[in-house]
């Protein structure tokens, strides 16, 4: 945060291991085992209050049409039992993010998910149709998380 105060571009990305409040909304409370909950997840709320933008939600603001699920990803080369965390639940969520602090001359131009199209759903490998832009890997995908790729233009 000191870098931002010093006039530097700040881009923060990674596996946050926590969903976003922008995904657990009134519109999604009855989806993916959210159990009717609207949750103000701490990390995303804190980042938003500090002025950071969620790249995926900036391009795709609707979590119903573009959930952007990143975990658990179906890695065909990994035994299913190593990928399943909650075999009776739909625990798919978007927990991998790229956030950025607005900066003069910096424009977000595109964002996509990188990884396999399939997910782990209720202990099974599933591939559902999605409107999310997914760039599939050419080779073996090594993790149970999909990645996020954001493209920026800097003047």
Identify the residue ranges that each predicted region occupies.
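Metal-dependent phosphoester-hydrolase catalytic domains
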Residues: 2-11, 17-155
């Amino acid at each position: 945060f000191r870098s931002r105060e010093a006039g530097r571009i700040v881009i923060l990305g990674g596996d946050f291991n926590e969903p976003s409040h922008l995904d657990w909304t009134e519109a999604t409370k009855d989806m993916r085992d959210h159990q009717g909950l609207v949750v103000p997840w701490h990390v995303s709320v804190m980042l938003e209050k500090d002025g950071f933008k969620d790249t995926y939600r900036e391009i795709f603001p609707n979590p119903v049409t573009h959930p952007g699920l990143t975990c658990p990803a179906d890695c065909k080369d990994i035994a299913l039992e190593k990928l399943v965390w909650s075999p009776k639940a739909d625990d798919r969520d978007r927990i991998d993010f790229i956030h950025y602090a607005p900066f003069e001359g910096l424009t977000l131009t595109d964002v996509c998910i990188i990884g396999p199209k399939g997910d782990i759903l209720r202990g099974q490998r599933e591939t559902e149709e999605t409107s999310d832009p997914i760039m599939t890997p050419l080779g073996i995908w090594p993790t149970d998380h999909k990645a996020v790729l954001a493209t920026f233009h800097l003047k």
